[in-house]
């Protein structure tokens, strides 16, 4: 947790930005996996954590800007609870730790909100992403689940995004702790990736590192695969073989729930094959092209376009594409081998604030998302500002199904040599990913440990 003053100041800034109304924050509850008592690991809602800091289930918070009061609603433990959990601080004790002096039982929440609505006051809430939140909002506010997101308050959303998107020095230090744990996870994967090893063994090893500190764990489900052309491959069903490329996309979340997110691509053999080295080096050029665009005021869309153009240039050099690389990038033809975005915001969520809406988080007000394949997957396009924390992760993927579909449809025939692609359909895919902070005059990589990137660094890491 942060200091009490941190939470008080965050709420004061939010109140000033929003101005009026009743702000409703639903904390998360326990959720059963296959029956009610067998629960998924609890994860508190990130906005609740940011403003109220209390990391346990069964809480709802209200900021009544009209009345000038803040309340946490929740129930005290009964003796039946204490038998299973042990003695815990009371709700009022916990509330005082974050600067809130008033608590009420959960049963009082519906009447509190009902009275405000009868007075004609506005209840401001965030888009729900859990089924139980949708049921609660229907009960509390009478809004059907199918239209709740339409009633979510844009003023509140934009105010929260503006606060959470700019990281303080204290937040950056905590994020770097998570990034360092993430780096150790990846260094272990370089050591373990050998012929005969199962993907699941490496996934288990990185989980152990992520979980080895109190309160720590994974920031998201690990991707550990030799089928890198499948962008989100969580199956862990393969055994590593000579000549494979092993891809790890994994990150740690620390006790404060800030995240790291890294990706690594490495040879299962001692070295990449010449063809693999060629694509890996092309990938590094695209990565550096994106990084060269990272500075205050420059839209992140330009970083994506720079990475796409570098990949297009490499595809032309290989004879897989033809024409002007810039035209290939702007047309969208590059997306045959790079169908996703270059990065995303990161913080308390690995895709930071994605529940609030990508349009608000990743795009400037009034800026429209592209509908073009490839560009439509940009989670981040807005002009960069000091304090932004985000990932950079261009990749190159040879996806047989996508190649076959585009060839059959005759898409971008003026740019793509489909016959040449036939020999590459068994290549797979690769990417690397690092986490960055925008500074006053540029950017810097987050973390005190170095993740291997160059061929020399990769080969050294595999032989430690």
Describe the function of each predicted region.
Residues 1-464:
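Active-site neighborhoods and metal-handling regions in enzymes and metal-associated proteins
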């Amino acid at each position: 947790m942060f200091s009490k003053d941190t939470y008080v100041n965050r709420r004061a800034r939010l109140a000033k930005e929003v101005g009026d109304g009743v702000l409703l924050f639903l904390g998360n509850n326990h959720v059963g996996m296959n029956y009610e008592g067998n629960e998924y690991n609890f994860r508190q809602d990130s906005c609740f954590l940011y403003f109220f800091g209390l990391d346990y289930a069964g809480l709802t918070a209200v900021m009544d800007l009209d009345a000038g009061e803040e309340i946490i609603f929740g129930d005290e433990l009964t003796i039946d609870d204490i038998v299973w959990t042990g003695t815990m601080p009371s709700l009022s004790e916990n509330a005082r730790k974050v600067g809130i002096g008033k608590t009420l039982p959960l049963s009082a929440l519906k009447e509190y909100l009902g009275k405000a609505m009868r007075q004609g006051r506005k209840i401001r809430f965030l888009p729900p992403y859990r089924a139980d939140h949708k049921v609660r909002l229907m009960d509390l506010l009478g809004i059907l689940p199918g239209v709740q997101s339409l009633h979510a308050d844009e003023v509140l959303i934009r105010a929260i995004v503006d606060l959470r998107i700019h990281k303080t020095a204290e937040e950056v230090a905590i994020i770097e702790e998570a990034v360092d744990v993430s780096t150790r996870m990846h260094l272990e994967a370089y050591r373990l990736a050998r012929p005969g090893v199962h993907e699941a063994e490496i996934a288990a090893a990185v989980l152990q590192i992520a979980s080895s500190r109190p309160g720590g764990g994974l920031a998201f489900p690990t991707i550990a695969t030799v089928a890198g052309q499948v962008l989100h491959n969580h199956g862990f069903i393969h055994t590593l073989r000579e000549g494979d490329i092993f891809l790890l996309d994994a990150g740690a979340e620390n006790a404060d729930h800030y995240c790291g997110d890294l990706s690594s691509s490495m040879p299962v053999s001692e070295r990449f094959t010449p063809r693999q080295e060629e694509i890996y080096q092309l990938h590094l050029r695209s990565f550096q092209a994106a990084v060269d665009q990272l500075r205050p005021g420059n839209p992140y869309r330009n970083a994506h376009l720079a990475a796409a153009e570098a990949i297009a240039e490499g595809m032309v050099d290989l004879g897989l594409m033809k024409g002007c690389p810039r035209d290939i990038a702007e047309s969208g033809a590059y997306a045959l081998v790079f169908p996703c975005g270059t990065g995303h915001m990161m913080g308390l969520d690995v895709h930071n604030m994605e529940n609030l809406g990508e349009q608000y988080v990743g795009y400037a007000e009034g800026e429209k998302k592209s509908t073009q394949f490839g560009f439509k997957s940009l989670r981040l396009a807005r002009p960069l500002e000091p304090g932004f924390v985000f990932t950079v992760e261009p990749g190159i993927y040879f996806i047989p199904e996508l190649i076959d579909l585009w060839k059959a449809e005759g898409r971008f025939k003026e740019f793509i040599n489909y016959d040449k692609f036939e020999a590459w359909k068994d290549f797979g895919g690769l990417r690397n990913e690092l986490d960055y902070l925008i500074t006053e005059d540029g950017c810097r990589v987050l973390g005190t440990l170095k993740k291997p990137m160059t061929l020399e660094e990769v080969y050294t890491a595999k032989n430690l």
